[in-house]
Amino acid sequence: MPYRWGMAVDLDKCTGCEACVTACHAENNIPTVSPQQSARGRTMHWMRVERYYEGNFPDVRVKFRPVLCQHCDNAPCEAVCPTYAAHHNEDGLNAQVYNRCIGTRYCANACTYNVRFFNFFNPEWPKPLHLQLNPDVSVREVGVMEKCTFCVQRIKAAKIEAKKDHRELVDGALQPACAQACPTSAIVFGDVNNPESRVARLMQS
């Protein structure tokens, strides 16, 4: 049976610490932008944590919601991409081929979750920050769209190791950076097609 990767987030466990956001930046070579660029709506965050407030001061309750690419089954971003840079792969992921992208930004306009980002400039990594770049992830250039990939580089590496050892992937052995960094284990990742996986059970609960 083919894999179908999915994620479940327990909002009651999320504390809004944004460790997931930081881990995502480090793992996927996401550039930081200046305050001026951020004010123009050019912030690069594959994952963000939204805050919702209930009640009136001093009895205020805060709820947090991590938001990232939903890897939609019928993704509207894929339908509008003229070069098929946005497409579904064999694992059910909404994948992005950077070399195909011509920067029309149609996909960003079609995305209902506002989780696709355009590179308005070539990223800069002043020394010694260039030493922290992850060699498993390509650095995107100006004019290219990017978004959450569920850390596809980790998925590919885990599948290669499993194939080499003639075994199936074990549930829980593979985690994207956000799930690995979450201190409360609010983010659960796994194979939705495996009914015994934790993520599949959570989605049914």
Residue ranges and their predicted role:
Residues 1-205:
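Non-ligating segments of multi-cofactor redox enzymes
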